[in-house]
Amino acid sequence: MKTIIAEKPSVAREIARIVGATKREEGYFEGGGYAVTWAFGHLVQLAMPDGYGVRGFVRDNLPIIPDTFTLVPRQVRTEKGYKPDSGVVSQIKVIKRLFDTSEHIIVATDAGREGELIFRYLYHYTGCTTPFVRLWISSLTDKAIREGLRKLEDGSKYDNLYLAAKARSESDWLVGINGTQALSIAAGHGTYSVGRVQTPTLAMVCERYWENRRFTSEAFWQLHIATDGCDGEVVKFSSSEKWKEKEPAMELYNKVKAAGCATVTKAERKEKTEETPLLYDLTTLQKEANAKHGFTAEQTLEIAQKLYEKKLITYPRTGSRYIPEDVFAEIPKLLAFIGTQPEWKDKVRAKAAPTRRSVDDGKVTDHHALLVTGEKPLFLSKEDNTIYQMIAGRMVEAFSEKCVKDVTTVTAECAGVEFTVKGSVVKQTGWRAVYGEEKEEITIPGWQEGDTLTPKGSSITEGKTKPKPLHTEATLLSAMETAGKEIEDDALRQAMKDCGIGTPATRASIIETLFKRGYMERCKKSLVPTEKGLALNSVVKTMRIADVAMTGEWEKELARIERGELSDDTFRKEIEAYTREITSELISCDKLFGSRDSGCACPKCGTGRMRFYGKVVRCDNTECGLPVFRLKAGRTLSDDEIKDLLTEGHTKLLKGFKSKQGKSFDAVVAFDGEYNTTFVFSEAKKDKKFSGRKK
């Protein structure tokens, strides 16, 4: 008998149908000489510190660096601590029995780093020695599964993939466990979660937040003239320079207004080609789904995974935006299929050779770019259909013709002021026709250098400089992809992918972790760090744990392990040294977290004392631990203001707060019924009964 192990029951069911394993047993399907079983995600994990006989959150025990990591069944948290998940333990027993009684194992977990780790951890935990082969496929269509089963690969081919996954798992444990415990010990109260990837990601969110909030807008003035264009249209020139002072701008404006003519000093005409966009990888799909439809990164990944399991798209957790030659041969057939759908009727070119920009064998990693499979998308929800049609539409764009424009730039001088105007006319719409996104054309007459223009009007406008906007999930994903470097070019971004932080498969969960930890929140599409997030970042922002570039280097090292260019032992030694350094740094934060008595009892429990710990005031009763963060809407509460809040349940009216939109406001800070702080505004204060009890 052969055992096939899939990553989840739904995939196992499809494979079982294809191999004829139709008899349902407890935890697997059987038939046709096969047993088809499944995991449900990671059934086996690295043990927590107590699994090594080490008590956690003890200063003298840090750093905790096991000689060898111990694997245990996935655990769940209970009132008495962590214990193995009973359902997981039962499934592991089923899998072990099947492994031990099989002639060989076919590994059908997801074809990627985490899928490989799910199987290998199980294999090692069960002490299995049965030989295994790998089913490596990029879609779950019947055709792909059958072809994959005919072309099974030796399991050892993916040893480096496993070693990279194992190194990632162990490094996250070392940094996360030691960093979190060190900082929490330094703080004295509460738990401050840090991680190899989550903390640098939070640092980027906080850095952009402060850059936005501390930005001082400055006024500027710009001049404009208008003249007749083609077919009665008006062409509007704008001054090349912008003035920070109104007086000199007005002085020049009056001269321009009085002038009767302008002279063309330069006329430049060029043909501009806009290449087709590359196909989607997961991160680009997540970015555009967030920007265009407001989907979270996690939501997009969940939908893409669902579409994959429904056989509608190829493997979603891909980091490549290219396809190999053999897949390109199937593109005409797939485009013809897309063209039969109502959404894309008349958008797919008939009998035309697809553009090859997204075709490059050398740029395909484990999986090629996202494609639809040719299976009909029936009975999809609105959200699922949105993601499916995005992938289909991108395929149509990527394999259409280039967009070609004639671009004209004209410079003219009037009363000593230089003015410019740019116009474009589309010669070949190409891929821009797919969504009809091409902007309205601006036709510039055939002016030549030395031509005299007669202005039909002039104006002066006032503008204001704007800060960089707060991060959205789309822009944060871009920053994670390039370790904070601002790169717009698709090809350059693709070249940087090994230096980013996180991977396409993990970035969504990293962002969600920051929400779950209470470090940031969504304000419409913007990501805003919470008081807790800002407080944490203020402590660690200059430390190595928050270094975005270095985290990008770790990802690069993991990619080298995957390619067989770096030993996992070398990486392990480096990450252990790093763990010792960041643990020492974070433990020393007790200087920053030095506590002192506020002189106030806890308003919530009444038995504890409220103590100042740097950016937070916290109850010293461990069963209560009420936290009050001093930083509120860009303003830090003083000791006296905190004492008013603790003793009266509210402060006096305070000035100098700044809203998430950057507007200043005045308010009272008060406790609500759950002892969370809230703002009460002056007009409402007269009728407001504060919920927090006075002690």
Task: Locate the predicted segments by residue.
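Basic, low-complexity terminal or inter-domain segments flanking catalytic cores
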Residues: 2, 81-83, 125, 130, ...
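Short strand-coil-strand connectors
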Residues: 30-32, 226-230, 413-417, 661
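Intrinsically disordered, low-complexity regulatory segments
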Residues: 1-169, 173, 179, 467
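Amphipathic alpha-helical transducer elements in NTP-driven molecular machines
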Residues: 9-16, 33-36, 40, 59-62, ...
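C-terminal or mid-to-C-terminal helical accessory/interaction module adjacent to the motor/catalytic core
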Residues: 87, 142-227, 269-270
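Metal- or metallocofactor-binding catalytic centers and their adjacent structured scaffolds
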Residues: 244-280, 286
